[in-house]
Amino acid sequence: MNFDITRYPILSFAHSVRRLRLLSIEQLPQLCTELRKYLLDVVSITQGHFASGLGVIEITVALHYVYDTPFDNLLWDVGHQSYPHKILTGRAEKIGSIRKKNGLHPFPFREESKYDILSVGHSSTSISAGLGLSIAAGKEGKNRKTICVVGDGSMTAGMAFEAMNHAGIIQSDLLVVLNDNQMSISKNIGALNKHLKFLRDIKKSSKIFNFSIFESLNFKYLGPFDGHNIFKLIEIFKKTKDYRKTCLLHLITKKGKGYLPAELDPIKWHTISQSFSSSSKILTYSDVFGSWLCEIAEFDKKIMAITPAMCEGSGMLKFSRLFPNQYFDVAIAEQHAVTFAAGLAIAGYKPVVSIYSTFLQRAYDQIIHDVALQKLPVLFAIDRGGIVGHDGPTHQGIFDLSYLRCIPGIVIMTPSNENECRQMLYTGYMYKEGPSVVRYPKGKGIGMSLSPMKLIPLGKSLIKRVGEKIAILNFGALLQNAYLAAEKLNATLIDMRFVKPLDTNMILKLSLKYNFLVTIEEGVIAGGAGSAVNEFIMMRKILLPVLNIGLPDMFIAHGSQEEIKHDYQLDPEGIQNKILAWLSY
């Protein structure tokens, strides 16, 4: 998107940090106005993270104006806030490509710009990395500053407090800027949020009181101040630049600032994305999960639903309103969410942890040590399994099958449609011997009608098509693509349904009848469902060629789900071509 100089006269001049610093302080309010307007114009066309960036315009301008970035280290936590930062650091005319294939990365990305010090996507990482950078800067002796902008709920995660606990005893030259907009993606909850509200209220009533939880961690606490007052921010940052101790600056902002609909409903406007047609009756997998949860809760008061700050995205909004005493939003605290569920299970309750695949990685030890080792019946509803698309490598849910499959006693189910997802959720809910997983993709189902709940026999697959010579074993939501490829190849197609326990009886039968086996999954091949098939075949000394189709040993960049599937040959034509190429070797 090109600049219209008449529409953005100041911003068109200050298209780089070097030129930004040539502006007078008096010109900065107009720059902020134009930057906000430009962000509105661009994101309304291109889609992407929206409300968070609007809330940090003044903070971004002031930081780059006062500090010597990129010599000084500026870290963003979470990366949703970084759109204004990208615009001011030489990427303004490319901002329209953000989240698109071969376009700008959706979050700060080290390979994209020298101003992006730390690649981010998950929350609460900046203070740890910032402390390391600050210690290194101190040893360097060049008076290099390190600033971490922490917002959108990132301060609620345990990792942030682990870092602050460490930073408080080291006393490095580190500035933590707390962007307090009272929101993550959903509304912030918890005791910390109440403490921040207490500090905001005290500031309104008295200037004498100046104690906070951060001072007890040996941080110099400053604030709270208005995060939209550009002149005050310049004044404050000029002072903090000269400090030689660990500081936390508390700034009050409004998520969605400058666009009234986003100010009034920052959850809805957190991201602007393509909407499904209002006339479409096809449910998303998240919708199916949410409705199933409500249906179970109608007759079971012991079912407890847990989410780490992803209520809306996981389809739990209706449940949270209808069953508030059975709903727990633990904030951005994935480790706590899992062990909290373990405690509920020990007490005889039926916990369901709803979590995105990419965020479950953060609680891996808890899954093993606190749930699986103790054989606790915790159901994990893993949303966004597989390719998620536009949010890129930090959010692709492609590692879960590999890191979960090796855990003893766990049941892993991969539905191929929304009705199968519903039945698997019920099967996991009824399973009492240990943890169970239902792993489903982002987006809509295929239009299957939902049938009454019933148990699926553990480890039992379904034959979807009978063909010759080739048997395709599909795990998960790529079944439709696999079916089209199987038709072209006249291959047998099996909906495996379970990654663990694997339907080994079916594999044995297929090995006696077919010349080739092909496995398909929407995840990394290494250690995944296909690897489980390979291991079984080798253990039984079966001499049968097997082709594993999935994602390669690399991080998958951003783009639409369809583009990525095409690029990695997971669409029908790609699957067919990959099999034909393999057969021709």
Swiss-Prot record:
Residues annotated for thiamine diphosphate binding in this entry: 80, 121-123, 153-154, 181, 259, 334
Top enzyme category: transferase
Domain of life: Bacteria
PROSITE patterns linked: TRANSKETOLASE_2
Keyword terms: Isoprene biosynthesis, Magnesium, Metal-binding, Thiamine biosynthesis, Thiamine pyrophosphate, Transferase
SUPFAM superfamilies cross-referenced by the UniProt entry: Thiamin diphosphate-binding fold (THDP-binding), TK C-terminal domain-like
Catalyzed reaction equations: D-glyceraldehyde 3-phosphate + pyruvate + H(+) = 1-deoxy-D-xylulose 5-phosphate + CO2
GO cellular component, one term: cytosol
InterPro entries: Dxylulose-5-P_synthase, THDP-binding, Transketo_C/PFOR_II, Transketolase-like_Pyr-bd, Transketolase_BS, Transketolase_C
Annotated GO biological process: 1-deoxy-D-xylulose 5-phosphate biosynthetic process; isopentenyl diphosphate biosynthetic process, methylerythritol 4-phosphate pathway; terpenoid biosynthetic process; thiamine biosynthetic process
Cofactor(s) in the UniProt record: Mg(2+); thiamine diphosphate
GO molecular function terms noted in the UniProt entry: 1-deoxy-D-xylulose-5-phosphate synthase activity; magnesium ion binding; thiamine pyrophosphate binding
A Pfam family reported for this protein in Swiss-Prot or TrEMBL: DXP_synthase_N
Residues binding Mg(2+): 152, 181
EC number(s) given by UniProt: 2.2.1.7
Pathway connected to this protein: Metabolic intermediate biosynthesis; 1-deoxy-D-xylulose 5-phosphate biosynthesis; 1-deoxy-D-xylulose 5-phosphate from D-glyceraldehyde 3-phosphate and pyruvate: step 1/1
Description of how the protein assembles with itself and partners: Homodimer.
The family this protein is said to belong to: Belongs to the transketolase family. DXPS subfamily.
Protein name, as recorded: 1-deoxy-D-xylulose-5-phosphate synthase
Taxonomic source organism: Buchnera aphidicola subsp. Schizaphis graminum (strain Sg)
Gene: dxs
